[in-house]
Each structure stands twice: as structure tokens, then as C-alpha cells.
């Protein structure tokens, strides 16, 4: 049996790392695949469904990223999908969220012009205890982001489908409590995955409930129902500012109203990145679990979509 590896970037580094970490495995690197029926595991960010279909003995897909919607767009494959849960990526995303929330909490955007330097000195800005941060999505990454804000003194609100018992987090659950969650937060950080239940979650009605809060999206762009809804909400002051590391489509069309807006920041999906050196070790550990007859971690629930 073989493991097929399909790196989406830095192929030589992945080859070197897996060679060291999985010396006893028969590793093939796409597109080299002499016998598709011998492929038992795939390590990749994505592959065409038509190619996956040729691996008739495939049992596991080990994703090279935290998101897994790319594997489920045309229905979940029969193979078990294992997503990447890397603390380094969680820390990167927490740092990104803290950076941008602090940027607008402290009014730093007002100092970037000569006029903004008038009245040099201290400014009257809300303190962290006066600036609750809401986290949409309370998985591993959302929990790390919440802890980062708590360490700085921010009250943290959390929204998810089922709620949370995380220490110190004010929990909101389900559609009925989403409006209250938004109204209680002065910044909203989205880390929800792309699933059928999250697509279009934030529409014009929901943006009107932000109450001037800053919106930071580092989950998936599909949570926003419409670019026009978001831009209109920013123009109306319902959303104080928006920082978008993810959009739909990605990147936005050149004519998108998101570009050139003085209260909208776009970054190119860099809030959290797969770091080969740490990710390869986590993937190799899951290969070892599979070989030992144990369940890898974390396994995607095909019904939930994550």
C-alpha cells in the first residue's frame, strides 16, 4: 500500500520532511502514481474528485489545511477526512485577530494622515474591559482567539450552534441568540467554517444588529451573504469597519466594492498559514495512529461539514 502526497506549495520541503518522518512508508508524490489501487491514504490540500475516484482502496484523506470544504463540495467521499489542527496556525490567527481588533479599538486608523496627528498625545479610547469581543465559532481556533482576548482583559462572547461551556466565555447558541450576541459585542471575529448552515449567515438584517462593531473575518468568505450588504452596512455605520482575510469569491473581482473603501481592509488569506515543519509532524502522527489501528485526530463529521 502507498501514501500519495500532493503538496500545494513547497514540494521539496514536504518531500524532505515526510522522508524523515515516515521513513518506512511507500510515499508517492503526485502526479507520480503507478498504481492508483495501491493508494490507501492521500495527504493534500485538494484534489480533483475524478482523480480521487481512481483510488479505489482509499481509506483516509489527511488535509494539509484546517478547512476541509474543498473535499466535500460534491458530497463527502467515502474515505475518512482528517483536518489539520496545528497550534501554530491557531496562534497566528489569534495574533491577526488581536492586531486588527486593537487597531480599531484604539483608533489607530485615525493617525495615518497628517490631520490625524492633530492633538498629539493621549486619546480617549475604550479600555479592554469596555470592549467585548465576540467570536463566531468556538472550535480549536476560536477557543485560542478567545483566550488571547481574555488575557488582554476583554470580555469574550462566543456563538456557536450548540453553545459552549468554555471558562469565562458568555455563551450564545443558535439563530435565536445570534442577534443578542452581535449586539453585545463591540468587535466580531468570524472563524466559522464553510458549511451549508453557515453560508450567508451574515446578511443585511444581521449586519444591522452589529451596532457599529468591527467585523474581522478569518473563517470563510461564504459567511457573508452579499458584498453589497456588507458595504452598505459599513457606509451606514452599522458595521464600524471590516477586515476581510477571506472573501467569496477569493480573491474578489477587480470591480468589487470592497476595494478602495476607507473602512474595509482586505488581506490575501494570510491570517493563518500551514507551516510545513509543524504540520508535517502532526500529519505523520496521524499516519502512525492509523497504522496502529487508532483513530486520527480531528476527524471531520460529514453531516456537520467540519
Model-derived segments and their meaning:
Residues 78, 129-132, 212:
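Phosphate-coordination loops involved in phosphoryl transfer and adenosine-cofactor binding
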Amino acid at each position: 500500500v502507498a501514501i500519495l502526497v500532493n503538496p500545494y506549495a513547497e514540494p521539496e520541503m514536504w518531500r524532505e520532511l515526510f522522508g524523515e518522518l515516515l521513513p518506512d512508508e511507500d510515499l508517492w508524490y503526485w502526479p507520480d502514481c503507478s498504481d492508483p489501487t495501491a493508494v490507501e491514504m492521500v495527504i493534500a490540500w485538494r484534489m480533483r474528485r475524478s482523480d480521487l475516484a481512481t483510488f479505489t482502496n482509499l481509506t483516509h484523506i489527511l488535509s494539509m489545511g484546517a478547512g476541509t470544504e474543498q473535499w466535500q463540495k460534491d458530497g463527502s467521499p467515502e474515505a475518512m477526512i482528517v483536518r489539520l489542527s496545528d497550534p501554530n496556525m491557531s496562534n497566528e490567527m489569534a495574533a491577526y485577530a488581536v492586531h486588527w481588533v486593537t487597531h480599531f479599538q484604539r483608533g489607530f486608523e485615525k493617525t495615518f494622515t497628517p490631520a490625524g496627528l492633530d492633538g498629539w498625545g493621549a486619546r480617549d479610547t475604550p479600555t479592554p474591559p469596555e470592549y467585548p469581543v465576540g467570536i463566531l465559532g468556538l472550535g480549536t481556533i476560536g477557543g485560542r482567539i478567545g483566550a488571547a482576548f481574555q488575557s488582554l482583559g476583554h470580555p469574550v462572547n462566543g456563538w456557536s450552534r450548540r453553545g459552549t461551556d468554555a471558562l469565562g466565555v458568555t455563551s450564545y447558541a443558535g439563530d435565536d441568540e445570534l442577534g443578542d450576541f452581535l449586539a453585545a459585542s463591540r468587535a466580531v471575529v468570524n472563524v466559522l467554517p464553510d458549511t451549508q448552515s453557515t453560508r450567508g449567515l451574515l446578511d443585511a438584517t444581521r449586519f444591522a444588529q452589529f451596532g457599529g462593531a468591527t467585523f474581522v473575518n478569518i473563517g470563510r468568505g461564504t459567511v457573508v451573504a452579499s458584498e453589497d450588504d456588507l458595504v452598505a452596512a459599513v457606509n451606514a455605520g452599522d458595521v464600524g469597519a471590516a477586515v476581510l482575510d477571506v472573501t467569496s469569491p477569493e480573491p474578489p473581482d477587480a470591480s468589487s466594492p470592497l476595494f478602495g473603501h476607507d473602512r474595509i481592509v482586505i488581506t490575501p488569506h494570510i491570517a493563518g498559514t500551514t507551516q510545513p515543519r509543524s504540520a508535517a509532524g502532526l500529519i505523520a502522527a496521524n499516519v502512525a495512529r492509523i497504522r496502529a489501528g487508532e483513530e486520527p485526530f480531528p476527524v471531520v463529521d460529514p453531516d456537520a461539514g467540519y
